[in-house]
């Protein structure tokens, strides 16, 4: 079965079967996606994080189907209805929808009209009607009038109920209706009578009708949200007449009275059983598709936000702007520690601009501020203009920073633990300042869903959303790497192979023993085993370490290669890193081995060229257009300018 999995995943993703086998082997051995994509390129054939995640997801889905098949086979076996042919069909089916169609006739049911008719002994009559040969079905039905069957029509109705259920469980019939939904399904939304005023924000959908397959994700999610709130009635429907005609061509083989009874049962089956069942199926599928697209957008937006360029270790002033309540100002040192906090009131209704300037001047000089981070909320633009019109004794850069989620952070346990003696306004301003210094390190403290970079985030599948966002954060943190001696436990948690417990153990060890001096010292951390060390070491940096490789992305398992390169050139590792001319003399082919290929050697040489390089690049300043004050102000869009920098 496992080999069959490999073939199916290979066909679905267009990745060789060998790569699938090797990648799954690493995943099953406990390797993380960031580790595999960075340090096992020879094994996977150079697969990236997205491809590895896709392999993992497909494998998990196939495992779920395999477990479902086992349950289905056991259930049918217990009923004594499992034939060799049926077992073969189930074992060969890997499409979940088709699998459930096969199982449907055997699936334990609640009390249905058909089941009630069977209990009245009407199944033989239903079989007779389905043959469509007898010209007098009423006469045959009269033989069943006894007990709970009160009259001929009652008998015929029960027989039709049995036929209707048979039609609804027929694979060909279900596929026929399913194909109609796929080709021509129309999504219709109408406002619930009497809810017009309450549903004003959904007025675009009050009388909406469009092709389901062309309905984009944000419209579908909006419609489904309104439906959940009881404001819209939503339905999906194909061409009903065409569907019934197709079903009649399949099941009605005569125009005699028996055929007419079957035709009536087919119409009832479509309206009462088949159409609602397939409609539910398509409602679920379309919601899943919309969720997938929305989650993808959310993850990509989050990735861009997390990988925004950092200002670095500079002294920063963070400002949470406001009008009536004033602006909360904090001063941070180069490590992000809080030095001072103050309130200023440069805007109406208080408008103490001279006093505000004096306080800012004092703080900028006293704490040697290099840059100012202004939150992009209320009074952001006015605060930026106020600052830019002042003459300070130091040159400072002014940045607009996203404050989304800062209020949630400021009230969180993390913030209370960091600043137990300060209120939420100070904590929020600190978060704004730190986001400029290192957005990644600060934003990992906030639930990604609270950062507000996704559409309809509360309407999509929360389990899938969390999984995607957590993986995005993990990928970003490991792409950048972290300083082992300054990283918070929240940041370390996302490092490959660690998790919350080991991350906290590292912080505790650091507090008790001082700064780490080498990566090897990680092995002294409680519960740090060889596997965890292998997974995390390459993503942890130690500036000023005795071994300069400890501050690079070169994995400890490859140190011997660099040491051999240095030895061959008659220099030290430090000299090799510092001297480009020496590095140009290296012929990587000399260091190839059965376990070390050219991808790893290229990564090593690239890292030696720029050890500890930050992939996020240098920070840039974006400014508001001074000519734009309101939505009605004319603008010449010769090029797109961004109003904020998300740092």
Q: What kind of feature is each model-predicted range?
A:
Residues 75, 100-102, 230-239, 254, ...:
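Structured, non-catalytic alpha/beta "coupling" segments that mediate domain-domain communication
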Residues 51-54, 61, 65-318, 322-422, ...:
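Duplex nucleic acid-engaging cores and interfaces of nucleic-acid transaction enzymes
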Residues 180-185, 319-323, 377-382, 401-406, ...:
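A glycine-rich phosphate-binding loop feature that marks nucleotide/adenosyl-phosphate handling sites
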Residues 52-64, 523-563, 589-597:
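Alpha-helical interaction/regulatory segments in DNA maintenance proteins
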Residues 67, 75, 425-426, 430-515, ...:
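Long, highly charged, low-complexity intrinsically disordered interaction regions
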Residues 20, 57, 344-348, 371, ...:
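Short beta-alpha connecting loops at secondary-structure transitions
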Residues 621-637:
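Short boundary/loop segments of OB/S1/cold-shock single-stranded nucleic-acid-binding domains
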Residues 639-646:
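Single conserved hydrophobic/aromatic residue that forms the stacking wall/gate
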